[in-house]
Amino acid sequence: SELRSEKRKLRMIVEGDVFLRTKFKNESKFVNGVEIVTTDADAYYLVTTPDEHYEQIRTMLIEGKHVLCESPIASSGKECKELFELAKKQKCVLMEGIKTAYSTAYSRLLLLAKSGEIGKIVSVDATCTSMRDDLDSLENKWNSISAWGPTALLPIFQLLGINYTDKKIISHYIDDDKMFDGFTKIDFIYPDSVASIKVAKTAKSEGELIITGTKGYIYVPAPWWKTDYFEIRYEDPTENKRYFYKLDGEGIRYEIVAFNRSIESGKNYSYIDSKISIAISEIIEACKSNNVIEI
């Protein structure tokens, strides 16, 4: 492509939420070879509302543009799968944006959890809540499962896989149409383990991540999704281990690097498998079904 042959800067347009847009622009300054522009772009970073994603991404891919999209990529698994297939056909990069996946501490704790350091994993429990948003008007606002679900689901799907045997979704809605969940809890059952997420925009809880094993557990304090520190704890506290890692730009910086490298090389440098992206979109879809238990 022109980009690879000339080694010129990747020209990106950033669209959507002002707060995240500014954050992304600031972090892009630390990445060589990326330039934020307003016209004539090679790629887009999308932080628009989830219901807009499918049409926007589809249009951009058809135009031959690369897309980094804040998760969820689509509101259904079918749409998400279709977009990845279209990206492949168009020889474009489509990457899901969950910045936590690119933080050094998070990558390290995944490796340690998978290595058997805490024995066999029997449970993964993630909580993400925030009450920043003014919810007087719900128009163009991300509901709890869209805003926090992908982040909370990430360690579950990366550690236990996507082949759960059952799930139970419990939500509290704050609108008459039952489209905006103020609080959602999802329990997953796997053949030999369990998992749960709690996400909320109208409730507050400790935003921690706990990975339970047969020998010990990994504890990541709040806010775990911006972690630079975690502990492995055992029955004997003298054996406990602490891990500290520098967190540069909440993971956004490394996310941009991975996106740029994927485009330059034609290889996939995303830390999130497309199967996981599809599984996340399936959960977003399931939260709109009649099987949700309402509280």
Tell where the protein language model's regions lie, with residue ranges.
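Rossmann-like dinucleotide-binding domain that binds NAD(P)(H)
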Residues: 135-205, 210, 275-278
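N-terminal Rossmann-like dinucleotide-binding module
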Residues: 1-28, 293
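Hydrophobic residues in well-ordered beta-strands that form the structural core
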Residues: 69, 94-96, 220
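Conserved acidic residues
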Residues: 11, 42, 122
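NAD(P)-dinucleotide binding in Rossmann-like oxidoreductases
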Residues: 175-177, 181, 190-257, 261, ...
